[in-house]
């Protein structure tokens, strides 16, 4: 039983660690891509009317990338949650309740209550995806608004 417990805990922990790291890597990649696109949009906006269509296409691409990365994050979040559930099952076997840190964290009622409470990674990431995606849409229509205002 002890050997099986050790193998199970090692397997579950590696699974959790892999997907938690994957989530952070994917988000870092998202930040890098959208940062480069934002810089490109800034340059094309400075050029004026020459690159109106390109600016709009990059804005649409920012919104599209935000949606794709949001969906990727949803999937990884499910995988992490599965690992947390398995880790909680293992923690139930601990006689010392102070060692049940994942169970304690998941039963916390202090997460995501409001602006001043602690937020989960998921909530922070989702807010980022929405804001950047919405900004991409605004940047897609900005050149046309600038064109109308100068006419």
Swiss-Prot record:
Subcellular location: Cell inner membrane
Swiss-Prot/TrEMBL GO biological process terms: defense response to virus
Chief subcellular location: membrane
UniProt GO cellular component terms: plasma membrane
Keywords assigned by UniProt, alphabetized: Antiviral defense, Cell inner membrane, Cell membrane, Membrane, Transmembrane, Transmembrane helix
Cell membrane recorded as keyword: yes
Protein name from the UniProt record: CD-NTase-associated protein 19
């Amino acid at each position: 039983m002890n050997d099986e417990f050790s193998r199970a805990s090692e397997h579950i922990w590696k699974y959790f660690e892999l997907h938690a790291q994957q989530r952070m890597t994917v988000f870092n990649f998202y930040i890098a891509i959208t940062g480069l696109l934002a810089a490109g949009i800034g340059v094309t906006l400075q050029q004026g009317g020459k690159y109106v269509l390109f600016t709009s296409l990059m804005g649409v691409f920012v919104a599209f990338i935000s949606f794709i990365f949001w969906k990727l994050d949803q999937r990884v979040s499910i995988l992490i949650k599965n690992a947390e559930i398995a880790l909680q099952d293992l923690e139930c076997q601990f006689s010392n309740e102070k060692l049940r840190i994942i169970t304690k964290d998941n039963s916390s009622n202090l997460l995501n209550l409001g602006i001043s409470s602690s937020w989960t990674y998921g909530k922070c990431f989702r807010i980022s995806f929405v804001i950047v995606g919405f900004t991409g849409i605004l940047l897609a229509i900005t050149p046309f608004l600038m064109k109308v205002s100068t006419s």
